[in-house]
Amino acid sequence: MKEVIKIFTIDVPYFNLDQIYASGQCPRWIKLKESKYVIPFRDKALKIEQQRDKYDWTRYRLIMSCTEDDFYNVWFNYLDLRMDCLDENNKIKRLGGKFKVPANRGNGIHILHQDYFEAYVLAKLITYVGYKNAAVAMNHIAEVCGVKHNQSMREVCRITWYEWPTPEMILEHHHKLGKMGKINSWLKRLCEAIVNDYYAYTKSDDELFRLFGMHDTTVFPLVGIEETLMKNFGEEPEEFADWYLGDIENKGLVYMYIVHHILNRPKEVR
């Protein structure tokens, strides 16, 4: 029996799709328009929209089209809807004036529970080639090596999206990737290590996972944070972690606020 697609409408305070998309952690989301996206995750895709409440413009609601099973067992966790962002946001604002603006501008950001392998590749690529080039590479890898889906969705007719490929799939289609500079050779070595040598990437580079969806926040994530902290906040990373973040449960969220602020600088008023 085919599962029934339902429309789920929920109020989620301190959750903003556009801010999450602009934070650099989900370059493979498909943006339909402001506050409306298609989210590919493994072998599923979700059409999701965020709307202001008609009677209270301080409140937003999420509208999702999916099966009941997928809502509770896939997307609720993927979007990190259990997290109390209001409490964490208030704690981060109390860190001091230099964090108040990033916390206000990114107060709807959640850290997504992404596919481990995809999150690992994304985080590594960001450290190698930066956010913009990493986003291009991630979509190219998925389109060349992943499984293609054409899915009918209300209001958008048919949409094409791609599953993120496994290491085996990347090795099979690696020759089709074309010239991607140092990304090509690194990606091939990584996949060979995983397939042939059982490289446990989920247990290495712990700081990468704290940033991109692994939610292991015992230590502040240091991926690219050294330069960002020194350049924009005048802080040493180790001192920042020890001194500022002792009471913050989701330390990765602090970094996402900073990254979102840096990637989306406010326009200067002339």
Q: What are the roles of these predicted feature ranges?
A:
Residues 1-270:
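HhH-family (HhH-GPD) DNA N-glycosylase catalytic core used in base-excision repair
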